Amino acid sequence: MEQNQPQLVIITGMSGAGKTVAMNSFEDLGYFCVDNLPPTLLPQLIEVIGQVRPKIAVAIDTRARDFIDSFFVVYEDLKKTNLQIRMLYLDARNDVLVRRYKESRRSHPLAPTASPLIGIERERTLLEGFRDKAQLLMDTSDIKPLALKERILKEFTEGERIPFTVNVMSFGFKHGLPLDADLVFDLRFLPNPFYIPELRPKTGLDLEVSSYVMQWPEAKLFYKKLVDMLEFLIPQYEREGKSQLVVALGCTGGKHRSITFAEAISKEFKNQYHIVTNHRDYVHAKEEK
């Protein structure tokens, strides 16, 4: 990327998922930030501001819901220019968003006199098209504002950002599906080390557990098929312009089988891609005996 190539980051997503933190983070990175700009004014903003401030961040949400249809027309036109565009979509689980609204004592903009959950569900429907087109999806359900800021700074800092990252995540279904996952694989069909007394307190990071999980013929066969599938799929996602691919591997609690497979897949692809391994429910796993 040329140093002076104009850049536009579109920040969107669920109300309460962290757009204010995101906008503050982009200001710290030297972006010219505009909140709630009608999409039809984007070309004029870029033309006027882009001459002196080549990095622009714009937050668009359901406050501009009357302009959502026009946004996608403008977005497709801008993609045909020399402008480098990335769309960041911020999301969080419904229960987390409801809690945040109650803590802030604010009503949801789409349900000012009703339950926040009603507004959240309406908003998800309205923003579905944005989520599908976003190059980067961040689930803020289980992270604090400072951690979100650090993640944004790392992702968008020039010279440090990795063009394409494969995020391999283990998780437990009983703790909820990861909202930012692109691919989800269910490992609950494999024999569960939880029922082996000496393995129960351990995790997939322990050799005894990983050896137990991978010893079964069905585990070996599934692993081979999974590697073959990812070898095909990862380049397809990269070609689509995504900045990352989140591969989520789940078992019941996120403690044994999912961690074993996440570690194995990470090692399998570490020499081909920039790999980030995230054991989402590891803290829960260590607490469970």
From Swiss-Prot:
It holds the Pfam family PapZ_C. GTP binds at D61, T62, R63, A64. It comes from the Bacteria. One of its GO terms (molecular function) is GTP binding. ATP binds at G13, M14, S15, G16, A17, G18, K19, T20. Keywords: ATP-binding, GTP-binding, Nucleotide-binding. Belongs to the RapZ-like family. Displays ATPase and GTPase activities. NCBIfam families: PRK05416.1 (NF003828). This is Nucleotide-binding protein Exig_2405. The lineage of its organism: Bacteria, Bacillati, Bacillota, Bacilli, Bacillales.
